[in-house]
Amino acid sequence: MKLNNASLPDVSIAKPSYDRSEIGVGIVHFGVGGFHRAHQAMYLDRLLSEGKAKEWGICGVGVLPGDRKMATVMDDQDGLYTLILMNPDGSRDARVIGSIVDYKFAPDDPEAVVELIAAPTTRIVELTITEGGYVTDDAGPDSVFGLVTTALARRKERGLPSPTIVSCDNIEGNGDVARKAFTSFAERSQPELVEWMTANTRFPNSMVDRITPVTTPDVIENLSADYGIDDEWPVAAEPFTAWVLDDDFSDGRPPYEDVGVLLVDDVTPYELMKLRLLNAGHQALCYFAYLAGYRLVADAAGDPLFAKFLLEYMDTEATPTLRPVPGIDLPKFKQTAIDRFANPSVRDTIVRLCFGSSDRIPQWLVPVIKENLRSGEPVRLSAATVASWARYAEGVDEQGEPIDVQDNLADSLVPLAKSQLDNPTAFVENTALFGDLAQQPRFVEAYLWALDSLHRDGARATLEALMNADDR
């Protein structure tokens, strides 16, 4: 049964109980992928199911060539898709999500996107454009920044309030990063708009959390076999979800607090906790795991040695850099994170975690290292993680098989990593990624030890040595 509005009454799993034709667009979301559909769109679907937020429906927008597939699927399925929660015991909870009521592929009609954002009914613009998506140097008028800035100028001319711009990407101070990016773009393209944006446009910081693997063919096949639903692009995710938002909006917001979103005055403590424990923990795991032969995150996290390494990193190096987090049991959060990684039903891949490392390590791990160098706290496990990335980036595993290093900077990183066989600090001398870490003796000593051990003894033996050492 093809999933769309016509077939929705016949769907046997949980589905929208609300009339989607009555839902107005109040949120424009750039970057509709698996995570947005498992997270922000899911929260809004919950509100709609409670008879709330009918003016806050989502219109997704794609700006990249690769977004055309999503545009086609959204059109074919009237914006409907299935969210499947993968429980650790092997059971699954499936629901059709209906909160995305429209989708526009910007390259086909950029003017329509601009007018949508400029419409008085649009009050929030959301972003999931990845950690590397906030560089505006080469951004043009048809980019996210160009489209939104043009729309803001029209709202200014029409005397309309500014929409709130909400970044939902895993970046420390994501709202601040978004503000800087949009302001920088406006200064070059429409300088007369900057003062109005500064006075009127809000960019709340946010913390988002849900492990959402890439949708694989077996997810699609199982959905059809188990429930009779033909969904071209369902989403599978873990049961855990969290969203913490600065309560700072320009023109209203949905009552997110009614469906479990935490609205706070300062999201920073929650954000640092998540990025430095969970996200950086993913990076601490993934390169060692790949080199040791693991290909699924759950298998690696279920290995007692790897779990011990993760908890040790969290306890001794990440935690000292955190601020007090109101209402959070930190030891429980850390153990829950490892348990989430080890969920065998969430078939998240090591390769996904390794993807785009040049955007991730500088955002999530390098700040931990720098803070601990300043404060005198340990850095050996963080330095070993950087060394494991450098070893992975050489492009050959421990069996001599090629590694497909998927990174925007792969063309420069792979040769740099290979050159460390002659110049051991070559990789970390990249100041754009690591700042001055190559000039920090305590970091360099720990890094060189780990890199030498990885080359000489391999990933598993290196972890064993790290876990058996009192200090290094």
Name each region found by the language model:
Residues 1-472:
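Substrate/ligand-engaging "lid" and interaction regions
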